[in-house]
A protein has these predicted regions:
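Sec-dependent bacterial lipoprotein signal peptides
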Residues: 1-15
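Second-shell loop/turn segments in exported
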Residues: 26-27, 94
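Gly/Gly-Pro-rich "capping" loops immediately C-terminal to redox-active cysteine motifs
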Residues: 72, 83-113
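Short pre-active-site segment immediately N-terminal to redox-active cysteine/selenocysteine motifs
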Residues: 75-78, 86, 134, 144
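Axial heme c-ligation environment in periplasmic c-type cytochrome domains
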Residues: 90-98, 115-144
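C-terminal capping alpha-helices of c-type cytochrome domains
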Residues: 105-110, 133-159
Length: 159
């Protein structure tokens, strides 16, 4: 009797988990690809800047030590569980060289507008394919994003 109950429970569990049909999947895929086509065809979208409110970030040649220190605190609280300061992937990509690969605007837009960037930006989508996990919204303020960018510059060797 106990085995019968276990078998019935497992059958019900697997039936509940597997409710995806081909028609639902194809509809979701086609609407997703349609939205990607319309978004990437948008002439106002700048892949060097990304999607968000940061259009021009003034970055001094010399590192702002105070901002970098504040950014290191943000990293310790909100970023270090998923990102290493090396090029090694943890959950998300490693940060070494990030400021060489992306503009300040792109990084700050990504950290403050993650979902829109993951839905629209080709570079963010490529990282998502590698990491397989969407970065959750960290609710960073504009100052936190700027300080975090300065810490990333410090990590990349800017003095």
């Amino acid at each position: 009797m106990k085995q019968l109950v276990i078998i019935l429970f497992m059958s019900a569990f697997f039936a509940a988990c597997g409710g995806n049909t081909d028609s639902n999947t194809s509809t979701a895929e086609s609407s997703s690809s349609d939205s990607k086509k319309s978004e990437t065809g948008n002439p106002s979208y700048d892949p060097e800047r990304g999607e968000g409110k940061f259009t021009k970030v003034e970055v001094a040649e010399k590192l702002d030590v105070a901002k970098a220190a504040a950014g290191e605190k943000v990293y310790g609280v909100k970023c270090s569980s998923c990102h290493k300061l090396t090029s090694e992937k943890l959950v998300g990509p490693g940060w070494l060289g990030a400021t060489d690969r992306h503009t300040a605007e792109w990084i700050m837009n990504f950290t403050t507008n993650t979902d829109a960037m993951l839905n629209k930006d080709p570079k963010a989508q490529a990282q998502l394919e590698i990491c397989l996990v969407r970065m959750p919204n960290q609710n960073l303020s504009d100052d936190d994003a700027r300080n975090l960018y300065e810490f990333m510059r410090k990590n990349d060797g800017v003095k």
